[in-house]
């Protein structure tokens, strides 16, 4: 009788793990268990009354690097090539990104010329930040906060404006608490290997497995900055679900896991609300803190490490305006914490993906709210009403983009504990977990956004590598 692998969590990580398990030459029996009634996790696309697409979670995927190429390969394997909407390298959404500082939008400099001349909100050309990086010695600490690293290597302005904003945009987090080693491993490794971020990124480019497909070649030739799918990014988890069903994978929805216990023969018992499953191996693609509450007493040290990997909430407000125009054309803008503790940034959805605008002319934006403001309100037990979040989002659109008319359509969603926080020393938590799993020979593999990357590409790769480890194949092949 073959092995049974139970995958916990039907977000993109769990779906990817199940997909790669099911495609093995001699696949195990795979059971995917999802607690909610829908698959896809935070990836969710909603169609408005006029057919416009609103993304409640991620809205674009980067094609760059080995992970970006692997996701494009997955898209092709699922037969979705014709659904891809690319943002090509010459498009304003690829070339223009902004910071909102001092009550105004400022274009981030790009190209050599942009680095050599003063570019507000920075007081001097960013060339000097690059020169500082080239002359700064390598750091000696095994980890460092993003703010400390950026200030040491690139200067206080880059740290407090650019990197602060980037941490808010990617992690909805605080650059003074987040780990450079875990949040931006390529920057950390560049310094460790080449003593310089710039040298490391230049000399380290192109490493990793070279994947090939028509879609990958097209993305490289046209220098895509990101891509989406015609019907929204939720098309990807929907296609994965259809594929899994066709391969005989058992997909259980609306079945929250109540507990995990080890049987005498070393198999797992997965307790659901009204039934239970047995598994030879578990891939957990649920949040680390959730898993920590399900583990048996024998895994208390592991549970303790996982419980310290916390996550923050983010509010996403989708706004649609009729007949409105943006003051600038680009991907969107980020807001440093010193400027506005409420607003993380605004994405100009209609610029990147006008094909998703719907039948009537209109402008789609996504306002992201979170950070310390949201954390403080949550800590006080305040009720975060849809009215409050919509009011703050509309105020930001008016103040920062001049959109003073009320929106024609609005969606408000508060994603509770949605983005894991890789705080200083996160790598030690992962090392501790890995050492415990190896020492105890527990048939458990960890996957998902809690560990080594929160982007869609990272989550898909996390699921793929988890499947490879269970199958005993080479994760990098």
UniProtKB/Swiss-Prot annotation:
UniProt binding sites for FAD: 9-14, 42, 57-60, 257, 449, 454-456
GO CC aspect terms: mitochondrial inner membrane; mitochondrial intermembrane space
Enzyme Commission code(s) on record: 1.3.3.4
GO MF term set: oxygen-dependent protoporphyrinogen oxidase activity
Main location: mitochondrion
Tissues and organs where the protein is expressed, per its UniProt entry: Detected in liver (at protein level).
Database matches in Gene3D superfamilies: FAD/NAD(P)-binding domain (3.50.50.60)
EC main group: oxidoreductase
UniProt subcellular location: Mitochondrion inner membrane
Pathway this chain belongs to: Porphyrin-containing compound metabolism; protoporphyrin-IX biosynthesis; protoporphyrin-IX from protoporphyrinogen-IX: step 1/1
The protein's required cofactors: FAD
Cofactor note: Binds 1 FAD per subunit.
Keywords for the protein's UniProt record, in alphabetical order: FAD, Flavoprotein, Heme biosynthesis, Membrane, Mitochondrion, Mitochondrion inner membrane, Oxidoreductase, Porphyrin biosynthesis
GO biological process: heme A biosynthetic process; heme B biosynthetic process; heme biosynthetic process; heme O biosynthetic process; protoporphyrinogen IX biosynthetic process
Record's bilayer topology term: Peripheral membrane protein
The protein's assembly and partners: Monomer. Homodimer.
Family label: Belongs to the protoporphyrinogen/coproporphyrinogen oxidase family. Protoporphyrinogen oxidase subfamily.
Function: Catalyzes the 6-electron oxidation of protoporphyrinogen-IX to form protoporphyrin-IX.
Name of the protein this chain belongs to: Protoporphyrinogen oxidase
Species assigned in the record: Bos taurus (Bovine)
């Amino acid at each position: 009788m073959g092995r049974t692998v139970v995958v916990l969590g039907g977000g993109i990580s769990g779906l990817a793990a199940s997909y790669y398990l099911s495609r093995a030459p001699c696949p195990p029996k795979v059971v995917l268990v999802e607690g909610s009634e829908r698959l896809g996790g935070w990836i969710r696309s909603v169609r408005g009354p006029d057919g416009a697409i609103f993304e409640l979670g991620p809205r674009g995927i980067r094609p760059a690097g080995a992970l970006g190429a692997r996701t494009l390969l997955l898209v092709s394997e699922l037969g979705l090539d014709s659904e891809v909407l690319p943002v090509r390298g010459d498009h304003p959404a690829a070339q223009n990104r902004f910071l909102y500082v001092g009550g105004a939008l400022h274009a981030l400099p790009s190209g050599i010329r942009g680095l050599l001349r003063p570019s507000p909100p920075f007081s001097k050309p960013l060339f000097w930040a690059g020169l500082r990086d080239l002359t700064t010695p390598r750091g000696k600490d095994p980890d460092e906060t993003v703010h400390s690293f950026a200030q040491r290597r690139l200067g206080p302005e880059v740290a407090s404006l650019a990197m602060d904003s980037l941490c808010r945009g990617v992690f909805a987090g605080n650059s003074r608490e987040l780990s450079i080693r875990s949040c931006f491993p390529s920057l950390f490794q560049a310094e460790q290997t080449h003593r310089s971020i710039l040298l490391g990124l230049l000399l380290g480019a192109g490493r990793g497995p070279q994947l090939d497909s028509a879609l990958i070649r097209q993305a490289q030739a046209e220098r895509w900055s990101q891509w989406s799918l015609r019907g929204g990014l939720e098309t990807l988890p929907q296609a994965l679900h259809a594929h899994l069903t066709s391969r005989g994978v058992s997909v259980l929805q609306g079945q929250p896991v109540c507990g995990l216990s080890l049987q005498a023969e070393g198999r797992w018992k997965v307790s659901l609300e009204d039934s239970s499953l047995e598994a030879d191996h578990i891939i957990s693609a649920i949040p680390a803190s959730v898993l920590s509450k399900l583990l048996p007493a024998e895994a208390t040290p592991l549970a303790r490490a996982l419980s310290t990997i916390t996550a923050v909430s983010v509010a996403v407000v989708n706004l649609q305006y009729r007949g409105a125009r943006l003051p600038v054309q680009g991907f969107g803008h980020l807001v440093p914490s010193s400027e506005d503790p409420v607003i993380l940034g605004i994405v100009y959805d209609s610029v990147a993906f006008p094909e998703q605008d719907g039948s009537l002319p209109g402008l789609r934006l996504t306002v992201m709210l979170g950070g310390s403001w949201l954390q403080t309100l949550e800590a006080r037990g305040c009720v975060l009403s849809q009215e409050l979040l919509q009011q703050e989002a509309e105020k930001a659109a008016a103040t920062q983009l001049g959109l003073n008319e009320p929106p024609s359509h609005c969606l408000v969603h508060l994603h509770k504990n949605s983005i894991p926080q890789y705080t200083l020393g996160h790598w030690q938590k992962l090392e501790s977990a890995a050492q415990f799993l190896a020492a105890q020979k527990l048939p458990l593999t960890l996957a998902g956004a809690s560990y080594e990357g929160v982007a869609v590409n990272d989550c898909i790769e996390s699921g793929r590598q988890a499947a490879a480890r269970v199958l005993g194949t080479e994760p990098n092949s």
